[in-house]
């Protein structure tokens, strides 16, 4: 059983991706990343501003970038044009960290601040441009099977459908659509946003998702380091369960012990 997780030609061992936002302290963020066992860490490039630049710079310095792969993301970008600019900035930051061959980007185009649903047209437009530039594009999308296929067709290296509204902890509101995306996709499906507890991470892995991205569920819980470890175990369990193959669902009962050679029949 091949346990490696591949995006484009890059192999990763962990199928859990961890975000770096909303932690209460640098130490908590660093310890959570370590406890998660992740290989990929995502950082919101657009949200590096005067208020948090010290935190982000310090976090970047704390992380061993020879061990972790940076996934720059364009969170906070409201248009395709803005997302394209931020993607290029993220690529430069990756190079400065020594990852000269890192052209990954988690593409987010979100025009409204209240519900934070991604713009499908803006995402498609930005993705097409970035793919032509040579980026490994991982678009964050609503759980729309048609859009997921269109993004795959233009050359995106993965798709990232949301489970529910980002940061909401509402869980798996769109599980049926995600299942369709998983069944139809020839690129990795990474479920992102809305997952609140480890059992939900396990469930999406059980239906065949390739990986899960978690941020708020870890960063904002009572004990982030413990939750990061729980998510690590949950994702691994879900992957193993899917690989093992569940039993068929039946409409009737069936005993687990044999009916022959029972006491009284011997």
Curated annotation (Swiss-Prot):
- Pathway in which this enzyme or protein is active: Cofactor biosynthesis; thiamine diphosphate biosynthesis
Keyword match Plastid: yes
State the reactions this protein catalyses. [ThiS sulfur-carrier protein]-C-terminal-Gly-aminoethanethioate + 2-iminoacetate + 1-deoxy-D-xylulose 5-phosphate = [ThiS sulfur-carrier protein]-C-terminal Gly-Gly + 2-[(2R,5Z)-2-carboxy-4-methylthiazol-5(2H)-ylidene]ethyl phosphate + 2 H2O + H(+)
Please name the Pfam families in this protein's record. Answer: ThiG (PF05690)
The record's GO CC annotations read: chloroplast
Q: What is its EC number?
A: 2.8.1.10
Enzyme class (EC, first level): transferase
Q: Mind telling me which InterPro entries this protein's record contains?
A: Aldolase_TIM, Thiazole_synthase_ThiG, ThiG
MF annotations from Gene Ontology: thiazole synthase activity
Q: What does this protein do?
A: Catalyzes the rearrangement of 1-deoxy-D-xylulose 5-phosphate (DXP) to produce the thiazole phosphate moiety of thiamine. Sulfur is provided by the thiocarboxylate moiety of the carrier protein ThiS. In vitro, sulfur can be provided by H(2)S.
Subunit structure, as described in the record: Homotetramer. Forms heterodimers with either ThiH or ThiS.
Task: Kindly give the PANTHER family that the UniProt entry links to this protein.
Answer: THIAZOLE SYNTHASE
The entry assigns this protein to a family as follows: Belongs to the ThiG family.
HAMAP family with a match to the protein in the record: ThiG (MF_00443)
This chain's protein is named Thiazole synthase
What organism, scientifically named, is this protein from?
Cyanidium caldarium
Gene expressing this chain:
thiG
């Amino acid at each position: 059983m091949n346990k490696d997780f591949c995006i484009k030609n890059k192999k990763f061992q962990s199928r859990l991706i961890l975000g770096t936002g909303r932690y209460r302290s640098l130490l908590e963020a660093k310890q959570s990343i370590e406890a998660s066992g992740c290989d990929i860490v995502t950082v919101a490039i657009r949200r590096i501003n005067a208020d948090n630049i010290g935190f982000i710079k310090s976090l970047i310095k704390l992380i061993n970038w020879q061990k972790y792969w940076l996934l720059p993301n364009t969170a906070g970008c409201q248009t395709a044009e803005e997302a394209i600019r931020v993607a290029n900035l993220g690529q430069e930051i990756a190079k400065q960290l020594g990852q000269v061959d890192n052209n990954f980007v988690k593409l987010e185009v979100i025009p409204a601040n209240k519900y934070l649903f991604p713009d499908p047209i803006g995402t498609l437009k930005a993705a097409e441009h970035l793919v032509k530039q040579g980026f490994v594009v991982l678009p964050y999308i609503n759980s729309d099977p048609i859009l997921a296929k269109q993004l795959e067709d233009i050359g995106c290296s993965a798709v990232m459908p949301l489970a529910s509204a980002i940061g909401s902890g509402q869980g798996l509101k769109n599980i049926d659509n995600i299942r369709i995306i998983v069944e139809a996709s020839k690129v990795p499906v990474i479920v992102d946003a809305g997952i609140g507890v480890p059992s939900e991470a396990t469930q999406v892995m059980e239906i065949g998702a390739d990986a899960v991205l978690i941020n708020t569920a870890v960063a904002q819980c009572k004990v982030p380091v413990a939750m990061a470890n729980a998510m690590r175990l949950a994702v691994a369990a879900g992957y193993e369960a899917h690989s093992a193959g569940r039993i068929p669902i039946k409409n009737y009962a069936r005993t687990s012990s044999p009916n022959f050679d029972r006491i009284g029949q011997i």
